[in-house]
């Protein structure tokens, strides 16, 4: 069974995870949010009182993460048998302040890459989103999409996500956070965020979530037709 694999990449607050979750529900397939994996590790480090001054030391990280077991089950992420989604939401700001640093560390990227590729091997039908899926994690994906939107729209989406009061200070804080995240993601030395050469660019600035889901669904159906595949 060959299967059908979809890679979705894009910058912060481009709507990747929300859209991929809806598509996975529509197609009844596995959805893997790789950004969530980095958030889980970041939360694990915070809870285990990591010494951030030593975070770049590989031996220190290996020892600290030796008992960190991350896995997916029925589209939910677990760490050491605990479902993590709610706790990640509750500690969102604390995690946001450190996740870019954690995601830039070679040891952690390699650790999660092995996990991601194991998931890909064991799930013929899946949609995976992140920042290097089409370029590094799943370069042979059947369909690659680079999802983006202008920074003003992404800021607005993040404000709505946080249910912020939209005060001037809050807007500035979110704006600075997204701009800094963009800079780090596009310029990091290992697996920087970039569009795969064979990815379809989809700008969602002027379309809503449902319209985006429908456009991607149509792209999936078109690609499957080209591959002479009927089932999903």
Curated annotation (Swiss-Prot):
Annotated binding of ATP, by residue: 10-18
Organism: Phytoplasma mali (strain AT)
UniProt-recorded name of the protein: Cytidylate kinase
Enzyme class: transferase
Keyword Nucleotide-binding: yes
Any one cellular-component term (Gene Ontology): cytoplasm
Any single GO BP term: pyrimidine nucleotide metabolic process
HAMAP family tied to this protein: Cytidyl_kinase_type1
Reactions it catalyzes: CMP + ATP = CDP + ADP; dCMP + ATP = dCDP + ADP
The enzyme's E.C. designation: 2.7.4.25
Positions of disulphide bridges: none
InterPro entries: Cytidylate_kin (IPR003136), Cytidylate_kinase_dom (IPR011994), P-loop_NTPase (IPR027417)
Pfam families reported in the protein's UniProt record: Cytidylate_kin (PF02224)
Molecular function, one GO term: CMP kinase activity
Main subcellular location of this protein, as a coarse class: cytoplasm
Record's keyword terms, sorted: ATP-binding, Cytoplasm, Kinase, Nucleotide-binding, Transferase
Compartments where located: Cytoplasm
Family: Belongs to the cytidylate kinase family. Type 1 subfamily.
């Amino acid at each position: 069974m060959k299967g059908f694999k979809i890679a979705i990449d894009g910058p912060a607050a481009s709507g990747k995870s929300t859209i991929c979750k809806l598509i996975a529900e529509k197609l009844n397939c596995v959805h893997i949010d790789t950004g969530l994996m980095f958030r889980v590790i970041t939360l694990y480090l915070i809870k285990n009182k990591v010494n951030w001054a030593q975070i770049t030391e590989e031996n220190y990280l290996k020892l600290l993460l030796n008992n960190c077991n991350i896995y997916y089950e029925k589209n939910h992420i677990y760490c050491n048998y605990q479902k993590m989604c709610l706790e990640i939401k509750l500690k969102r700001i604390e995690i946001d302040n450190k996740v870019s640093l954690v995601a830039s560390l070679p040891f952690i990227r390699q650790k999660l890459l092995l996990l991601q590729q194991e998931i890909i091997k064991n799930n013929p039908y899946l949609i995976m989103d992140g920042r290097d899926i089409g370029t590094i994690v799943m370069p042979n994906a059947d369909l690659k999409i680079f999802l983006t939107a202008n920074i003003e729209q992404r800021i607005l989406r993040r404000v709505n996500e946080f249910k912020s009061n939209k005060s001037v200070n809050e807007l500035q804080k979110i704006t600075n956070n997204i701009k800094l995240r963009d800079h780090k993601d596009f310029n990091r030395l290992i697996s920087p965020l970039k569009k795969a050469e064979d990815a379809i660019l989809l700008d969602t600035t002027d379309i809503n979530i449902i319209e985006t889901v429908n456009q991607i669904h149509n792209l999936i159906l078109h690609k499957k037709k080209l591959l002479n595949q009927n089932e999903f």
